[in-house]
Amino acid sequence: MVFFPHRHLIGIKGLTETDITYLLDKADEAVKISRQREKKTSTLRGLTQINLFFEASTRTQSSFELAGKRLGADVMNMSVGNSSVKKGETLIDTAMTLNAMHPDVLVVRHASAGAAALLSQKVACAVINAGDGQHEHPTQALLDALTIRRAKGKLSRIIVAICGDVLHSRVARSNILLLNAMGARVRVVAPATLLPSGIADMSVEVFHDMKEGLKDADVVMMLRLQRERMAGSFVPSIREYFHFYGLDAEKLKAAKEDALVMHPGPMNRGVEIASDVADGPQSVIESQVEMGVAVRMAVMESLLISDNNGPRSEGVGA
């Protein structure tokens, strides 16, 4: 019997409340390991992890690398800039090449939505989505949930305000799916130009005014203004954006006194968040980074190891 019934982690969509709770509970155990003097275990000894990042990443890639090493895996970071991809090799060709090397888990980040799902159909190993276009970023949502649960003691019946560039954010999508699954009350706060069509169908409350959206919120989750994904003029100016939608001390007063301030990083200080708030007593941004390693340890162990501490067989779950 395998406790976690999925072979891959492509998105939050498809995970049950039980699945999510299982991963968060296992991540809690990983936090303890990460805080020990001796952090390395032999859980994934003899297994190979390949990190395949087609988009630049510091936090996510280093977090996955550290998670794999703490579990005892052999970790390889594939540099796309120096790979055959730059010479015209397709994603599928790359997948077939890597599959021939018999890795046990492939961690992939790609600019195209659906890239991780496509790879999972072409390789024999487990696939973890580290972000695919504007689609999903499941481990970010899990680490955010773990951060909230450890601080608040629960996820159900809390108010979470997700603020900023929702349109271009895979982080927002995954968080909305997870928080709804766990019984939280989710709000999105953004100008109309930075909201996707059909946002109201995602079981969220929509606000265009920060103070209204933050009223009595337990958690304020800021999103990076993703200028690299913008093809048009979504905001009049950075200065005006910060004036209306940047989180400063005055706007934060609308939330509960003990509200958590979160940001997935990297932050644009003075754009979506003021420095005194990012570095203030309500900020749990550094805790999010710590929880990221623990969550990724939990995900890899859950995908690769069965309940009797042996490697999982091929083709388990979906």
Swiss-Prot record:
The keyword ATP-binding does not apply. It comes from the Bacteria. Its EC number is 2.1.3.2. One of its GO terms (molecular function) is amino acid binding. It holds the Pfam family OTCace. GO terms for cellular component: cytosol. It is an enzyme of class 2 (transferase). Keywords: Pyrimidine biosynthesis, Transferase. L-aspartate binds at K87, R170, R224. InterPro entries: Asp/Orn_carbamoyltranf_P-bd, Asp/Orn_carbamoylTrfase, Asp/Orn_carbamoylTrfase_sf, Asp_carbamoyltransf, Asp_carbamoyltransf_Asp/Orn-bd. Carbamoyl phosphate binds at R59, T60, R109, H137, Q140, G265, P266. Pathway: Pyrimidine metabolism; UMP biosynthesis via de novo pathway; (S)-dihydroorotate from bicarbonate: step 2/3. The keyword Transcription regulation does not apply. Disulfide bonds: none annotated. GO terms for biological process: 'de novo' pyrimidine nucleobase biosynthetic process; 'de novo' UMP biosynthetic process; amino acid metabolic process. It catalyses: carbamoyl phosphate + L-aspartate = N-carbamoyl-L-aspartate + phosphate + H(+). Belongs to the aspartate/ornithine carbamoyltransferase superfamily. ATCase family. Catalyzes the condensation of carbamoyl phosphate and aspartate to form carbamoyl aspartate and inorganic phosphate, the committed step in the de novo pyrimidine nucleotide biosynthesis pathway. Heterododecamer (2C3:3R2) of six catalytic PyrB chains organized as two trimers (C3), and six regulatory PyrI chains organized as three dimers (R2). NCBIfam families: asp_carb_tr, PRK00856.1. This is Aspartate carbamoyltransferase catalytic subunit. It comes from Allorhizobium ampelinum (strain ATCC BAA-846 / DSM 112012 / S4). The lineage of its organism: Bacteria, Pseudomonadati, Pseudomonadota, Alphaproteobacteria, Hyphomicrobiales.
